[in-house]
């Protein structure tokens, strides 16, 4: 699947990093929604319908894990990548055990980020394909 088919929501309260992430992802061919807070992300998620969310861990108001928890309740298959300048092994273990797809510490290499994005979207695409195949199999059963 080409990158242009994918929508990525980026959430960070640092405007400079938000611009940088948006530029890098857009240059890689993704459609990007850049939002400054978890609250704004929740308000826009149903409209933008992202295939992936990348969020800062520590933000004023709703932090990245609270955002993840809300998104995960609504759409468990939606992959989320957490970015943080305050990374620790216990935080990473907690995040991944709760279902976060990836966890990157700032500063991060753009190549590492794009690799995580590609992996997350590949998994999402494979899950969608399996669901489609199951739907087709069900449909065939109904018409036989």
Regions found by a protein language model. Give the residues of each.
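Acidic catalytic/metal-coordinating carboxylates
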Residues: 36-40, 63-66
């Amino acid at each position: 699947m080409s990158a242009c088919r994918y929508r990525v929501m980026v959430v960070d309260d640092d405007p400079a990093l938000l611009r940088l992430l948006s530029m890098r992802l857009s240059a890689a061919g993704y459609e990007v929604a850049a939002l400054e807070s978890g609250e704004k992300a929740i308000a826009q998620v149903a409209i933008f319908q992202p295939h992936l969310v990348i969020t800062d861990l520590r933000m004023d108001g709703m932090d990245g894990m609270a955002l993840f928890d809300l998104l995960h309740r609504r759409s468990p298959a939606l992959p989320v990548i957490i970015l943080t300048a305050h990374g620790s092994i216990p935080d990473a273990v907690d995040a991944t055990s709760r279902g976060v797809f990836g966890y990157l510490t700032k500063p991060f290499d753009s190549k590492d980020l794009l690799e995580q994005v590609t992996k997350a979207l590949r998994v999402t695409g494979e899950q969608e394909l399996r669901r489609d195949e199951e739907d087709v199999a069900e449909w065939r059963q109904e018409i036989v």
